[in-house]
Amino acid sequence: MDYVLTYADRGFSGNPYAAGMDRTYSLDALPQEYPSLGTGDYRNIALNIKNEKGVESADLLFKSYEIRSGKYQLQGLPAVWADENEAQTLEIVLADENAQVEVHLLYGVLEETDIITRSVRIKNTGTGQITIEKAAAACLDFVQGEFDVLRFYGKHAMERNLERTPLGHGTIAFGSRRGTSSHQYNPAVILAEKGTTETAGSCYGMLFVYSGNFSCEAEKDQFNQTRLLLGLNEELFSYPLAAGETFTVPEVILSYSADGLSALSQQYHNCIRNHVCRSKYVHMQRPVLINSWEAAYFDFTGDTIVDLAKEAASLGIDMVVMDDGWFGKRNDDNSSLGDWQVNEKKLGGSLADLITRVHEQGVKFGIWIEPEMVNEDSDLYRAHPDWAIRIPGKKPVRSRNQLLLDFSRKEVRDCVFDQICAVLDQGKIDYVKWDMNRSMADVYAGNLSYDYVLGVYDFMERLCSRYPDLLLEGCSGGGGRFDAGMLYYSPQIWCSDNTDAINRTRIQYGTSFFYPVSAMGAHVSAVPNHQTGRVTSFHTRGVTAMAGTFGYELTPALLSDEEKQQIREQIKTYKKYETLINEGTYWRLSDPFTDEIAAWMSVSEEQDHALVSVVRLMAEANQATVYVRLRGLKPDAVYLEEQSGRQYSGAALMHAGIPLPPFTREYEAYQFAFTEVKEAGTLYEKVRKWCDRNAKNRVVISLYGGSGSGKTTLATALQQYFLNDGTGCYLLSGDDYPHRIPKRNDEERMRVYKETGEDGLRGYLGTKKEIDFDRINEVLAAFHEGKDTITLRHLGREDGEISSEETDFSGISVLLLEWTHGGSDDLHGVDLPVFLESSP
């Protein structure tokens, strides 16, 4: 591919000394794999190293490379994992002897997953100290192309809103300096070619496997080239490296799609489910939980939790989670963080007793923790005020009346870890929600933010190792630390503190660009919603929450019997489709920021099942019909919509779509479940072969069998298969050809039975006495004769509702007769009888 590189004398673009007098060779104009400061490349850099004299320069030259089986791993950091035969590692070593530094570029290639990972190890090979001032994990240079930058901005309770910006000359930069990946920007970016849509166009993704400060820079330079960088934020970062020490830059996951944004998202979803999350629960059905927070906040007792468990069990909920307020003197958010001892007075007994009482109700038990925090009004702070992060000589910045414990220090982590383990060892705790409700402010050293995050990872690694059966859910005021680093330890993260169903459609939409549905904590909450005051129906809240891990945040005792029954039905529905929702291929069908609906769907791997969810976001008088086009189906397959019983071809569903019912109220929601009629495809192949062997201009095929054999479903699907291949096919129901309308025919059957018994009834059913075989035989004969117009009979439900209609049969070469009596000896003109023994 070196032919794409061009060389010219670029004014004011310097030339490396090694290039001699060649003024056409400039690092300022050529793509770089890992650009550094001080080389004559004036674009944004990946690496900046300062030596003991304060010189900032690193001229990295190729030293060696190695390709090996398996995927590299990173000590103390989360990273993509793979079996030995699923990945390869490329390691490129760059060196600057003058700066006395080696840079190891690590590439993990997961070919079947369409994923490449990148990380960097920086080694001080000298005798003195060096300082890393900036370190990106990956750099991508493009010599041409017009791109849009897709980033995901937000705030507390409204995270990961998609913003698409054309990349003009200069730099688009975003990131976090809050100590976490943050609510404000997610550590992820997409570079999409102009015009790229959900289903077409080229796009490149980068996802940082890290939960702390990060920086992303997209730059279009003077020569219309593009550079994309993602890595550690250089602000508040200055990492000293002593002689012989090595620093590891966290990993970036890269992927590319030539088929639009949906395909890119699906590649990331598969990677996270199968190569990032390690929890045993990632591919398991997870418990539907109810959390005590919105039901009680801090105002609860042990009896309150048990009562909640009783209600939960009666509703089919699997687990009760006791949220904030069970420890120390924690009756509000001003005290006791750091004192992880059970408040037995508040609970009315020991935690072990409470766990037993909850389990006796037939539900599991979960608990809330916030290990990284401390209140000044706590025994821990009074004993160790120096354990809170603060700048010496300066009062700390408070947030939510709490301070941040210095998890970069092992003794701090060990103390809190021992406290948490003492709690978890008191009984069978099935679930833990790990929260973090403030950002880092008092950064006292350049290494703090990085070492802090590694301390959190160390704590979580120890927790997961000690309690492998524990379901861990991450949280940081909702989605303030929703990143791939956290998903390495917890298979799900509370998506947002905002549980409003309408806001959630947008939050979950933005989240889905990189993260799978199985990672998104989503619950049905009470109305008016506690964050927005909005009122939406129970059904709408349920449909939205089913695009996540599904659970409840409300007080069951305040619900009506009708609402409680809705919960039972919602749980049944969710559990029926849970595997499809969490493991299926996810498709975005609308943009809830611009469209009048939010719509999404999940399709099974075999493309034989699909669940479509739609929420109306606006309502207006005399509203036009809204159509939803589906994606990811087999074009030639026939699908049965479970609720209506209607059948559609995959092509029709994807190109024409399905019309939504007229709305009756604001914020309505709908779900449509589709199942492929597989037997029709198998039957079609056999019938098609028969037709090809027995070449006739017109063929009559009779599908017959007893009640419940699936004649109607199969015949409708078979007709669609013929139409799909361009064969004109008409479906005729034999139910229009009894002598009498159904009501009168039932009366006649009863009369015959009363007068002649069972033998007489058998002599009536399906014979010429009941059926007008002469009339239907005339239809079949006219069809075989090639007539273009044939008179068909229509039988209604009431007296006098018997009519005839001239029907156009021009272009029809296959007549499908669907009828219980389609195998009768009195029926003439059938070319291929097909008997159905049982329901498909």
Regions found by a protein language model. Name each.
Residues M1-E219, E235, V638-S644:
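Polysaccharide-binding surfaces and accessory modules of carbohydrate-active proteins
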Residues A58-F62, Y239-A258, Y670-F674:
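Short Pro-Gly-centered flexible turn/kink motifs
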Residues Y281-C421, Y431:
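Aromatic-lined carbohydrate-binding/catalytic grooves of carbohydrate-active enzymes
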Residues K346-S350, R382-H539, T549-L554, L558:
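Active-site neighborhood of glycoside hydrolase catalytic domains
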Residues M618-K678:
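C-terminal beta-sandwich/jelly-roll accessory domains of carbohydrate-active enzymes
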Residues Y730, H739-G796:
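Conserved nucleotide-sensing/catalytic segment adjacent to the nucleotide-binding pocket
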Residues E801-S839:
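ATP-dependent NMP and nucleoside kinases share a basic, alpha-helical "lid"
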